[in-house]
Each structure stands twice: as C-alpha cells, then as structure tokens.
Swiss-Prot record:
PROSITE patterns: S4. This is Small ribosomal subunit protein uS4. Keywords: Ribonucleoprotein, Ribosomal protein, RNA-binding, rRNA-binding. Belongs to the universal ribosomal protein uS4 family. Disulfide bonds: none annotated. Pfam families: Ribosomal_S4, S4. SUPFAM superfamilies: Alpha-L RNA-binding motif (SSF55174). One of its GO terms (biological process) is translation. GO terms for molecular function: rRNA binding; structural constituent of ribosome. It comes from the Bacteria. Residues 98-159 form the S4 RNA-binding domain. Part of the 30S ribosomal subunit. Contacts protein S5. The interaction surface between S4 and S5 is involved in control of translational fidelity.
Length: 208
C-alpha cells in the first residue's frame, strides 16, 4: 500500500486525536484539529455507531499513521513483536519507538517523524560514527545518534532543536544539544508513552 500523500491534518481529525504530524504547527493556533475536531467530509459531524471491529481498525490506523508506516511495514513490525518474548502489544510500541526516524524526532533533530524519515534517507545522521540511511533501523542501548558535521547548519535541524522543549525529552534518551548528538540510555517502557493508545485492540485485530 502506498504512503499517504494527502493533508495530514485530516488524519488527526479522522482519528479524533492530535497526532502531531505537522511539527510546530500542531502547537499553534493554526492547528486544524483545534479548530475542527470532528471527522472530515460532508457528514463528519454526524454521530455514527461503530462496531468492535471498527474500533480495533481505528486504533491500528491511528498508531500506524502516527509513526508514518505503510500497512506492510506496520504488519511486519507487529509480526516481529508477536514472535518476541513478552507482551505483544508492548513489544509493538517499543519497536516503533526504537525506529531511527522516531528517535531522531524524539531527540528534537526533526520537527516531525515525516521530516526525520526524509533526513535519515538524505544521510544527515550517523549512528555510532557510521552513516545510516534506513529510517526503520532499530537503535540499541548505548547507541549514539549524531548530526553529521556538514548538516549542523541545516535550517530544519536547527529550527527543530529550538522547539524541542515543547515536546520534552523521553527519559530513555539523553541529549547533548551543544554537540548535536543523543544517546540511547535504555529501551522505552510502556509508561514512557503518554499518547492515548490501546495496543491490545491491535493484537485482537490481527488475531482474527
């Protein structure tokens, strides 16, 4: 399935939750979700009854879109989580958080995950001193993610770093802002994820 190319503000309205897909704009009074927090379309303001399957599907779509994955990518991530030890739903969220593009967003080197994914592909970052251009690469404890020397004056990176205070830094990451680098001190745990997510609904959906 192709990646969504339409207005990302419609996604937040569809999922009835601000997913922070447009970076700094989501914190401003220009945010479309704050102005129209009902689903898009002609009948968006109508109340409709939704089935159990529909609830599960919406939860899957919400998390998939928040992290910017295609259906195939999301399903593969779920299968890896299902085969690993532990709770499948928690494993899924931890694996999504450990993606390199997400870590770069969390560190404040990008305004949103979409921007982070693009910058990874353009070789703006190194992991443990080596160039990595795969957004889905999984970081590990002790990994150092650094902005390459020639990229430290790129406007989108410097602007994003100025705005990171609004989001806050997760406890499992450490940021050395002066040297444009971050360190993975631990793996994220469920309590680190404050966005409303019901991962068990996704497990139920894929178990059918």
């Amino acid at each position: 399935m192709a990646r969504y190319r339409g207005s990302v503000c419609r996604i937040c309205r569809r999922e009835n939750l601000k997913l922070f897909l447009k970076g700094d704009r989501c914190y401003s009074d220009k945010c479309a979700f704050d102005r129209r927090s009902y689903p898009p379309g002609q009948h968006g303001q109508r109340r409709t009854k939704i089935s159990d399957y529909g609830i599960q599907l919406r939860e899957k779509q919400k998390i998939k879109r928040m992290y910017g994955l295609t259906e195939k990518q999301f399903h593969l991530t779920f299968k890896k989580a299902d085969h690993a030890k532990g709770i499948t739903g928690t494993n899924l969220l931890v694996n999504l958080e450990r993606r390199l593009d997400n870590v770069i967003y969390r560190l404040g080197f990008a305004d949103c995950r979409t921007q982070a994914r693009q910058m990874v592909r353009h070789n703006h970052f190194t992991v443990n001193g080596h160039k990595v251009n795969i957004p889905s690469a999984q970081v590990s404890i002790g990994d150092t993610i650094e902005v390459r020397e020639k990229s430290r004056t790129v406007a989108v990176i410097t602007n994003a770093m100025e705005a990171v205070a609004r989001r806050g830094l997760p406890q499992w990451l450490e940021l050395d802002k002066a040297n444009f680098k971050g360190v993975v001190n631990a793996y994220p745990v469920r309590e680190d994820l404050t966005m409303p997510m019901q991962e068990q609904l996704i497990v139920e959906l894929y178990s059918k």
